[in-house]
Each structure stands twice: as structure tokens, then as C-alpha cells.
């Protein structure tokens, strides 16, 4: 067994309580109301996964964690952080003996429950520790291969996620433009457009 329990912290205690009420039966969770209690509950060398809004919020949480962790511990930034910020933070934490892993995660809320696609960067040493855990929770391809691989050092994970998001948004734009052309140029009704989109399912145009 890779881990016996998962420590949980949110600065809004009510959100932690809602998670416990909803998913307590899914595993063994250890809720904390203070960040210091959260870090104290982790087995050494500690792994702390941060998933908050990119930018100042991420920086604030990482700064707070860095003051509570010890050399050899790992901080995983699983938000949509700009890869250059990840490179800067990784270098700063490395000077303190801490490891930062910038990790792209794709799948949304459904992926969190059923298995996401995971794109971790960071040092090879960090992935040796994280790899088995990530592979156990990631989505799986049709051949059973976990949808996770170490994509490179420092900000590589967030760089790959940035490219992933760019492709996804381009696909969404193509779908929107196809809808607009079918409606305004083709003169199709909304139900007719829906029928066209349905006919594309299972083909090379499926999305």
C-alpha cells in the first residue's frame, strides 16, 4: 500500500468539513484546521500538494509551507502556474533544501474522482518518491498504462500543461466556429446543428 492516509487542509474550514462529509468513506483522511497541524501530520520526508489559484495565492501558500517544512521535503504545485514562476520558485526552494514539483493536472472535478492526466516536472529524485503514488491515482489509457510521466526538470510540468491548455482552447474555438458557420452560413436550426455534431461522434471529428 502506497499511503495509509491523506492529510487535508483548507484555509476555509467549512470546505474541509464538506469534503469529509462527502468523501470520508472513500479513504482515511486527516483534516487539519491549521497549516502547522497539517504539516506536522505528514510522514517524513513529507509531500505537500498545493492546489490553489495560480499567482499570488500559490506564492503565499508555498511561502508558508516552506517555513514549516524541512530539507528533503517535497512541495507539489498542482495548479495552473506559469512555468517561469515555477522555475523561479523551484530554484528558491532548492536553496533551502526543499524540492518543488510543478505538476500539470487535467481532468477537472471528474478527474479528481475518477483519475486525472498528470504532468509532473521537477527533479528525478522527486519523481522517484512521487511516481508510484501518482501512477496509482492517474487515469489509465486503453492499454492500462497510467496517464502520468515525468516530463522534465523545474517548470517542465507546467509548460506541458500550458501547451495542453492551448490545444484544448483551440479545439473549443474550432467547435464554436463550426457551430457559427452551420447556423449563419448553412442556415441550420439549433436541433439540426446538434444532429450534425452527434453524427461526428465516433469519427475523426469526435471531441
Model-derived regions, located:
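Rossmann-like NAD(P)-binding element
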Residues: 11, 15, 19-88, 92-98, ...
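N-terminal-biased segments
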Residues: 41-54, 187-202
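Conserved beta-strand termini and adjacent loop/short-helix elements that scaffold enzyme active sites
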Residues: 9, 32-34, 103, 151
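Short beta-strand element of Class I
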Residues: 5-7
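Rossmann-fold dinucleotide-binding core
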Residues: 58-63, 82-194, 202-207
